[in-house]
Amino acid sequence: MALPCAFLSAAAAANATSFSSSPESRRCRSVHRVPSRPRPPLAPPARVMGKGNSKRKAANTRLWMRLDRRGGCEMILCDKSFVARRSGLPARDLRVLSPLLSRSPSILAREKAMVINLEFVRAIVTADEVLVLEPLAQEVLPFVEKLRKHFPLKSLDVDDVSTHMHTENQDGELAQDVSCYEVEGANHELPFEFQVLDFALEAVCLSYNSTISDLNRSAIAVLDDLMKSVSTRNLERVWSLKSSLTRLLASVQKVRDEVEHILDDNEAMAHLCTARKTKGQKDLLNTILFPETRLCRTHSSIENSTGIRTCVPSDSDAHILDMLLEAYFKQLDGIRNRIFLVRQYIVDTEDYISIQLDNKRNELLGLQLTLIIASFGIAINTFIAAAFAMNIPHRGYHFVIGVPFGQFVGATSFLCMSIVILLFTYAWRNRLLCT
C-alpha cells in the first residue's frame, strides 16, 4: 500500500488511503507508477589465479633485507621486478644473484648501483642503501650483523655537517659549532658503497680463513691416523679432505681473479663509485643555497671544472678503492698460499705412505721369490724320486734293497739343496731379495 506524501494533510491522507483501496485507483496507480532506479551493473567476475600461477609467483619471491646508510633496516619479501625498480638494474644483472644459476663471483658496476656476488654474499648497493639477498642464511648472518652494528654508529656524513653548520643562532649569525677537524673526519670517511664492499670482502675472507683452519686441523688428525694405519677408511677420509681443499681453492681463486680484474681495469674501478653522482648533486644544491660556506678541500677535479668544491675527489675515491682491493687481494693470496701448504702437507704424507707401501710390496715380492726357489728345489727332488721309484719286479731286489736306496736319496737331496743355494746366492748378489 502506497504511503501518503509528507506535505499532505490528514484528511487528504485519509482520502488518498480510501482512493488507493478501490480497483480504479489500482489501475491508475499501475499506469502512473514511477519507474524504479536502474540496477547497478554487475561487477566483472574476479580473475581466479590458478595454482600454477600462485606457485610460480611464490617461487619468484625471495627474502631481502634493506639497510640504508642511517641504519634503518627492514625485511622485504618481493620478486625481481620490485628489486629492479628499487635499484634501477636490468633483469640480466639480477640473474647474477640467482642461487639457481652457477655463476662465478663477480662485482658489477652499473650507473646507479653495484652488484656484489661473492660466494654467499649477494647484495645490491646503491648510493643510499643496500639490499641483501637471503639475510637469514647461516653463512650470511655475520655479514648482516656487521652491517647493522656499523652503520648506526657511522650515520654522520658531510651533508649533516654542512646542514648543521648553516643553522643560525639566536643572534641571527651562522653557528660555528662544528670544528674543522670534525669536517675533515667526515670527509675522510669511506663512501657508503665502499664500506659495504669492504664488509662483503671481509666476510668472505673470514669464512675462507675459518674453513681453511678447520681443514688444517682435520688434515693433521686424518694424516696421523693414516700414518699409523693405512686402511681403506683412512684413505677415503684423505680423499674427501683433498676434494674439499680443491673446491675451496677454486672458490678462492675465482674471487682473487675478480679482485685482480677490477684492480687492472681503471674504468670499472671508476664506475664502482656510485655515490659520487648523488653527493655531487647534493653539494651543488648546498653551494647554491649557502654560497658563503664551503668545505676546504683542494685538488678536486670537479672544483677545477665547475668551481664547486665537493666532499671527496674522484682521485681520492679511486686511490681509496685501489688500496682497499689491494689489501684484500693480498689477503686472498695469503689464503691461497695456506691452501697450497695444506695440500703440500697432504701430498708429502701420501708420498711417505707410498714409499712405505712400496717397501711392503718389495718385501712381499722377496718372500714370493724365496718360496719359488724353495719350491723349485723340492719339485726337482720330487721329480727324481718319482722317476726312479717305478715298481719293476727283479729277482735280486730283496738282496740289494737297502744298499743303493739311501745313497741315491742322499745324493739327490744334496743336488737339489745345491741348486737352491745357488739360486739364493744369485738373487742376493743381484739384490732381488730385501735385506
UniProtKB/Swiss-Prot annotation:
GO terms for molecular function: magnesium ion transmembrane transporter activity. GO terms for cellular component: membrane. It is found in: Membrane. It comes from Oryza sativa subsp. japonica (Rice). This is Putative magnesium transporter MRS2-H. Residues 20-54 are annotated as: Disordered. Keywords: Ion transport, Magnesium, Membrane, Transmembrane, Transmembrane helix, Transport. It is a multi-pass membrane protein. Putative magnesium transporter. Its main location: membrane. Coiled coil: none annotated. The gene is MRS2-H. One of its GO terms (biological process) is magnesium ion transport. The chain crosses the membrane at residues 369-389, 408-428. The keyword Membrane applies. Belongs to the CorA metal ion transporter (MIT) (TC 1.A.35.5) family. It comes from the Eukaryota. Pfam families: MRS2-like (PF22099). Signal peptide: none annotated.
